[in-house]
Amino acid sequence: LKKRVNFLEEAFALLGIRDIEAVHGRAEEFAKNKAYREQYDLCVSRAVSNLATLSEYCLPYVKKGGFFVSYKSGSVKEEAAGAEKAIALLGGKIKEIVYFALPDSDIERSLVVIEKIKNTPARYPRKAGTPLKEPLS
């Protein structure tokens, strides 16, 4: 992971991007820190876990009125429906699902757009590993 942070820092410098910071650490730990919790307009994730788990990792970073956008593969309607209760518990609401195909292919992808409508309860995210082992439902 530190290699990724170093790469991002170099990319920011080369591109002249300012007022941005790449940090190394666990999402579950940083989300408990007031400097990061509910401070961002947008949080994005790639398809590394189910939507309920990703929401528990990401929604605590998003301030009210902001968005969490999850990049997922294929059709995600069933997964999204199964995660709605968890998303609501975490302060979010699914606003839309955008389906698209990657250029020059028939590979389907989707973006699940979740709006943050209320603050995430302080007990979330749970300790490291718990969201993955015991997803909210």
Show the residue positions of the predicted features:
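Residue-level signal for inorganic ion chemistry
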Residues: 8, 72, 114
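Short "lid" loop at the C-terminus of a central beta-strand within the Rossmann-like core
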Residues: 28, 73-77, 102
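Helix-to-beta-strand junctions that scaffold the AdoMet/dcAdoMet cofactor pocket
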Residues: 62-64
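Short strand-turn motif at the edge of the Rossmann-like AdoMet-binding core
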Residues: 48, 71-75, 99
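Conserved SAM/SAH cofactor-binding pocket of Class I
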Residues: 1-49, 55-56
